């Protein structure tokens, strides 16, 4: 995480960035609050119980609160994205 209440006292939101190498995927997570992200490089998909949704560089993503999701890099270059939450730290998150 780049911006949290620890790095910017008084902040009400948080900001971070992630890099996913080709062929990698996160585990399924669900956040207590919504998440927004912007894809700076690469291509991949958000995987949910409803199925995959592809994304590529230049696209913005919105993940509603409580939605189980994973991020997968389906391309041949790193996926780089910035993400944010309306929470002063990384929000309460469940994993499965």
Predicted segments — roles?
Residues 16-18, 59, 69:
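Hydrophobic/aromatic beta-strand elements that line small-molecule binding cavities or substrate pockets
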Residues 26-28, 46-47, 63, 69-75:
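Short beta-strand His + acidic residue motifs that chelate non-heme Fe in jelly-roll/DSBH
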């Amino acid at each position: 995480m780049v911006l949290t209440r620890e790095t910017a006292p008084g902040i009400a939101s948080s900001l971070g960035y992630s890099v996913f190498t080709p062929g990698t995927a996160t585990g399924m997570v669900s956040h207590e609050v919504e998440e927004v992200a912007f894809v700076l490089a690469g291509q991949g998909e958000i995987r949910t119980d409803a199925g995959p949704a592809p994304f590529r560089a230049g696209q913005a993503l919105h993940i509603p609160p409580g939605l189980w999701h994973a991020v997968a890099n389906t391309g041949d270059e790193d996926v780089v994205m910035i993400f944010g939450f309306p929470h002063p730290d990384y929000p309460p998150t469940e994993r499965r």
